[in-house]
Design a protein with these regions (language model features):
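A solvent-exposed interaction/effector surface
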Residues: 26, 56-63, 82, 113
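A broad, low-specificity signal for short, low-complexity segments enriched in glycine/proline
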Residues: 1-3, 16-18, 28-35, 67
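Amphipathic alpha-helical segments
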Residues: 14-29, 86-90
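Vicinal oxygen chelate
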Residues: 2-12, 32-33, 39-42, 46-56, 60-83, 103-108, ...
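Short acidic, gly/pro-rich beta-turn/loop elements at beta-sheet edges
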Residues: 18-20, 50, 63-65, 80-82, ...
Length: 125
């Protein structure tokens, strides 16, 4: 038997704000709020095949590019429309040396955590 990813934990300055951003991006809902921690996940709740995201408050600033990032896919619109939606939600473009020929967009959430918007290649859940 193998393990599966059930939670991804993100250290951040504003757990509630970052949780709200990622709820908008992923269509997730807030599942639990305990102290300085906010957990979000699919509407199905805990135990879903998709992992939850936990945002924990930290006072330590981000110092370098993360070695792990999320890739997201639009499920109900094309990549250009999804890019516009994500930018309106608070994402911003990030230049990491792309050539312009890539099939993805590199973005950052409101606290500067990088993620990529890929071409649509998944079905809605």
């Amino acid at each position: 038997m193998a393990c599966r990813i059930t939670e991804l934990v993100v250290d951040c300055a504003d757990p509630a704000g970052l949780a709200a951003f990622w709820c908008e991006v992923l269509g997730y809902v807030e599942l639990e709020r305990v102290g300085d921690s906010v957990e979000i996940g699919p509407r199905a709740g805990f135990g879903s095949p998709q992992p939850t995201l936990v945002f924990d408050r930290t006072t330590e600033p981000k110092r370098a590019k993360l070695r792990l990032h999320l890739d997201v896919n639009a499920t109900d619109r094309d990549q250009d429309a999804e890019l516009e939606r994500l930018l309106a939600a608070g994402a911003r473009p990030v230049d990491i040396g792309q050539t312009g020929a890539e099939s993805w967009h590199v973005l950052a959430d409101p606290e500067g955590n990088e993620f990529c918007l890929l071409r649509r290649r998944v079905n809605p859940v």
